[in-house]
């Protein structure tokens, strides 16, 4: 579904999302890097870059996470599954090539059996992409059948 969000409306949009309990993530300067990271306001958003130094995938695949805990009770093992691992979030400023990876991974994590961690995060996280106005030698959008201004992804 295509919608347009104008730069002048970022601040009120970010504030309203945060008021609704969404974690807001966007490209943000961190020393000499541009990282997708949580922001408090639209003034932290940096859009003058080709691609971020990290991918949206890290918000779907944390580096570490608790997948279960267990307790030994006499002759049996009690297993507890974690709750609240899928946080409502909006990621601004993803490039189409990065967002295009999600439907590909959907096929992997919903093939034979469904990965509930993946599914719940996919349902909880909304991606807002921005078209590219420049590229560098590491860009690969055309390699995956996209273009810098792709509507899919």
Predicted regions located by residue number:
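Iron-sulfur-associated redox domains of electron-transfer enzymes in respiratory
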Residues: 1-153
């Amino acid at each position: 579904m295509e919608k347009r969000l104008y730069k002048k409306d970022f601040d009120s949009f970010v504030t309203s999302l945060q008021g609704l309990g969404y974690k807001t993530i966007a490209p943000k300067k961190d020393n000499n890097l541009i990282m997708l990271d949580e922001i408090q306001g639209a003034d932290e958003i940096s859009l003058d870059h080709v691609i971020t130094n990290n991918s949206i995938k890290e918000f779907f695949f944390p580096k570490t996470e608790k997948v279960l805990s267990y307790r030994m009770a006499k002759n049996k093992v009690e297993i507890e599954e974690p709750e609240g691992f899928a946080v409502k979030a909006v990621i601004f400023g993803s490039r189409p090539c990065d967002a295009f990876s999600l439907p590909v991974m959907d096929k992997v994590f919903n093939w034979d059996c469904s990965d509930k961690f993946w599914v719940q995060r996919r349902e909880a996280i909304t991606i807002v992409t921005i078209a590219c106005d420049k590229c560098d030698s590491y860009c690969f959008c055309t390699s995956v059948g996209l273009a810098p201004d792709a509507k899919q992804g």
